[in-house]
Amino acid sequence: MKKLISILTAVLTLSIVASASVTENSVEYDLYQQNAVIHISNRSDYTITVKVMRISGGLYATRTIGPRGSSSVSFEKSGDFYTKTKAEKGLETLYKKGSSFNVYCEADGYTEGALEFYVSGYGSSGQSISRAEFEKNY
């Protein structure tokens, strides 16, 4: 069973655009459980810090990614998450809260997804947040 979900979300005031795609993979054997994984790519000239937050509360993971870099976050359990993102370049710092997403990680399958972040000067969508809100880990 494979599902492909594409999401395009504009993030940050000069607008960091995060696009996501998710594939759910079926596991034929119940002998082991594969971890879910989300690959994060920074397609901008900004250094970004992405906080993966549990919707039920609390910080799950933080990744700081340099310009044009990438990283991954592994998940051992299913859950609902969202991102808080900070983009920095010189004296400019932008903060946004991203849309929610679901991660599936069970004996019968797991999520493998991708988030790509872009910084664009064409408007913004998503929720702007303050530095204080970004710094909170709950």
Model-predicted segments: where are they?
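Primarily secretory-pathway and cell-envelope proteins
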Residues: A20-S56, A61-R63, K84-Y138
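Amphipathic, positively biased hydrophobic alpha-helical segments used for protein targeting
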Residues: T9, G79-D80, G109
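Sec-dependent N-terminal signal peptides
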Residues: L4-A18
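Short, solvent-exposed S/T- and G/P-enriched segments that are highly enriched in secreted/extracellular
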Residues: I65-S72
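Short Pro-Gly-centered beta-turn/loop motif in secreted/extracellular proteins
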Residues: S72-D80
